[in-house]
């Protein structure tokens, strides 16, 4: 009986404190909030509503050179689970408008940054030219002799 009274005396102040001081201990999650192109660094931070307990980062490929990066608060992270994702559309291949990188987390400003290999993925367009072997000429720079040889060979062959 004495043990029960001691336990009750120890727990009662904790229950009273949590009931009366709930407003001071409200979990106010803070997340980055932005929608930008090709940049995972977002300076804006917002305080999420009380019932929302997760931050998200979604990046979607717009085209081969641009990513739309969206960061905000969310209460639903099912988009990261394979079982919750919609099935693939049959017969259509989408080269753009697909997820590039997603993140869902539940701590203060946890959606900062993004993947570090973005620079390697977004390479500039460059033309690759191979060296021509000896004796060949570039298209449009052909010599008169090669033109005549081509005409003669095309007339000889059936």
UniProtKB/Swiss-Prot annotation:
Membrane topology: Lipid-anchor; GPI-anchor
Expression induction or repression: By p53/TP53.
One GO term (biological process): negative regulation of cell population proliferation
PROSITE patterns in the cross-refs: LY6_UPAR
Disulfide bonds: 31-55, 34-42, 48-73, 77-104, 105-110
Keywords assigned: Cell membrane, Disulfide bond, Glycoprotein, GPI-anchor, Lipoprotein, Membrane, Signal
GO CC annotation: extrinsic component of membrane; plasma membrane; side of membrane
UniProt KW Disulfide bond keyword: yes
Compartments reported by the entry: Cell membrane
Signal peptide: 1-17
Family annotation (CDD domains): TFP_LU_ECD_GML (cd23555)
Domain UPAR/Ly6 span(s) in chain numbering: 29-134
Function (record text): May play a role in the apoptotic pathway or cell-cycle regulation induced by p53/TP53 after DNA damage.
Protein name as annotated: Glycosyl-phosphatidylinositol-anchored molecule-like protein
Lineage: Eukaryota, Metazoa, Chordata, Craniata, Vertebrata
Gene name as annotated: GML
């Amino acid at each position: 009986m004495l043990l029960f009274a001691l336990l009750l005396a120890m727990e009662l102040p904790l229950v009273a404190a949590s009931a009366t001081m709930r407003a001071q201990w409200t979990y106010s999650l803070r997340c980055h909030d932005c929608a930008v192109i090709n940049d995972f660094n977002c300076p804006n931070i917002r305080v999420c509503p009380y019932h929302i307990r997760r931050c998200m980062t979604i990046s979607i490929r717009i085209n081969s050179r641009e990513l739309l990066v969206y960061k905000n608060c969310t209460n639903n992270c099912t988009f990261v689970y394979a079982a919750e994702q919609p099935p693939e559309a049959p017969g259509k291949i989408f080269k753009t408008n697909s997820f590039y990188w997603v993140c869902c987390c539940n701590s203060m400003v946890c959606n900062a940054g993004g993947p570090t290999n973005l620079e390697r993925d977004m390479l500039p367009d460059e033309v690759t030219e191979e060296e021509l072997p000896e004796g060949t000429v570039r298209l449009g720079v052909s010599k008169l002799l090669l033109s005549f040889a081509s005409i003669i060979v095309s007339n000889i062959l059936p």
